[in-house]
């Protein structure tokens, strides 16, 4: 990825963090977006990117706001000197036993973060993406096998998988590839901050053939490969990493 310029949302932790560090190690300059309250984690990622000798740009802000999403892309392009990799990774996941427990405000928060934000960011980025550029979306095995307590989150991941395939057909003729990563049970802050019940956490990932949850670093190479030029025939694909579970 030498000389490539990447923007990653949710780059402060979990899979976004792992992808950002891996991109830097492969020679890319990286801009990460994150919620302002995650500044300490984000600054750690920035230092790790710089330690690889690459340019690192921190762009805090709330991607539920369309104007900010436009500013995010503009800042990334200006600071990096261009853009050719967009990783739409930020997500909101909250466990609710019943649909009756989800307020309209909570539902809207999930939709804005997981669906609206990629729409706004990709629209803003497209004028800057030249042939050979790549868009990567983080979906989930929840797109194929939704949990009953992740009603809102799971449907956003099904939508993510769908827009990956739709955009791949739309942008392929322009030389822009669009692919996705569908993680299974990966140990990230999403799980321990309300994304899973305490009961689930006790055996999180235990149902997979590998018998354990995955770590974000175990997915990083997928994000690298999908961004690499030698993956030039991968378009509209969703790559799974779920310890033997899941369908992709």
Regions found by a protein language model. Name each.
Residues 96, 207-210, 223-224, 235-248:
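Short C-terminal tail/terminal secondary-structure segment
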Residues 91-93, 136-160, 164-173, 185-186:
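Catalytic loop of short-chain dehydrogenase/reductase
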């Amino acid at each position: 990825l030498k000389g490539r310029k990447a923007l990653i949302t949710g780059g402060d932790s979990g899979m976004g963090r792992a992808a950002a560090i891996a991109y830097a190690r492969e020679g890319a300059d990286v801009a990460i977006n994150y919620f302002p309250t995650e500044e300490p984690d984000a600054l750690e990622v920035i230092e790790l990117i710089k330690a690889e000798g690459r340019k690192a740009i921190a762009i805090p802000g709330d991607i539920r706001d369309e104007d900010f999403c436009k500013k995010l892309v503009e800042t990334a392009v200006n600071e990096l000197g261009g853009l050719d990799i967009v990783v739409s990774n930020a997500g909101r996941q909250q466990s609710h036993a019943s649909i009756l427990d989800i307020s309209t405000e909570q539902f809207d928060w999930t939709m804005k973060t997981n669906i609206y934000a990629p729409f706004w960011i990709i629209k803003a980025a497209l004028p800057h993406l030249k042939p050979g550029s790549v868009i990567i979306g983080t979906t989930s095995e929840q797109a194929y096998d939704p949990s009953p307590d992740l009603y809102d989150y799971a449907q956003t991941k099904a939508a993510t998988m769908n827009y990956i395939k739709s955009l791949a057909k739309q942008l392929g003729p322009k030389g822009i590839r669009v692919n996705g990563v569908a993680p299974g049970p990966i140990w990230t802050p999403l799980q321990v901050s309300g994304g899973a019940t305490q009961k689930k956490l006790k055996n999180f990932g235990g149902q997979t053939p590998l018998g354990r949850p995955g770590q974000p670093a175990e997915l990083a190479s997928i994000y690298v490969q999908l961004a690499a030029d030698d993956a030039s025939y991968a378009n509209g694909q969703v790559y799974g990493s779920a310890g033997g579970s899941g369908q992709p």
